[in-house]
Structures are given as structure tokens and as C-alpha cells.
């Protein structure tokens, strides 16, 4: 959903690299029109320092997040990256983000897209 919303909002202006923990996730992001995609720990670690923005659920920066799909190396690379991180507070782990009100996923993605529009000075 994130890639689809970014592509719809930014068109070809956005250069989207889809990095998935598994091939199904990468394939879904490629279907949503990411420019390129790669799968697995090495791809995520290697590319995390080569992007401007990292998006996804907050669990991508938690070792063993997403039911164990996020390895400690992935979490470290993503959280240590100099890229700006726009993470969605999806509470699939035993983690509660205090102070945030629960919103449906489409609303969270809309907010993420709007933040990126502000950052990159894109008008709707």
C-alpha cells in the first residue's frame, strides 16, 4: 500500500527501491510500481545506506520484528541508516506506541505521503 500511494502521489518523480524481507513482499511492491526491488538480509543491509527515506512499519527497526522476519542485522542497518525514517505505528509485536491514537492503515499512509510531499515540496 505504501508503494502504491507514493507512486500515485509522486508519479515518476519518486525513485522507489522496494526492499522486502521475503519474495512475496518484494513482488507486491514491484507490482505497485517500485522502480527496482531486492529481497533478504543482504539486500536490506546493503541498500539501507543508499536511500533517502525508509518507510514501513515500526517493526522494521526491531530485531526479530515481523514474527522474526527482521533479523538483528536488518534492524541495525535500518535504524542506523542516515536516511529519514517515516515509520507506521503498526503494533504487531508486543509493543505499544504510547501517545499515538489508533488510525486505520490507509489514514497512516495518507499522513506518510503528506509528510513526504511537504519535505520534497510537492503540490497535490
Features from the language model and the residues they span:
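A cross-family phosphate/adenosyl-ligand binding-site feature
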Residues: 1-56, 61-124
Amino acid at each position: 500500500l505504501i508503494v502504491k500511494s507514493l507512486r500515485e502521489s509522486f508519479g515518476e518523480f519518486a525513485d522507489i527501491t522496494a526492499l522486502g524481507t521475503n519474495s512475496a513482499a518484494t513482488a507486491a511492491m514491484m507490482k505497485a510500481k517500485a522502480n527496482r526491488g531486492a529481497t533478504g538480509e543482504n539486500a536490506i543491509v546493503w541498500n539501507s545506506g543508499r536511500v533517502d527515506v525508509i518507510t514501513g512499519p515500526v517493526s522494521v527497526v526491531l530485531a526479530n520484528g515481523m514474527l522474526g522476519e527482521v533479523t538483528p542485522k536488518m534492524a541495525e542497518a535500518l535504524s542506523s541508516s542516515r536516511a529519514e525514517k517515516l515509520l507506521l505505528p503498526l503494533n504487531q509485536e508486543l509493543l505499544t506506541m504510547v501517545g499515538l491514537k489508533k488510525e486505520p492503515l490507509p489514514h497512516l499512509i495518507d499522513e506518510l505521503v503528506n509528510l513526504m510531499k511537504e519535505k520534497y515540496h510537492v503540490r497535490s
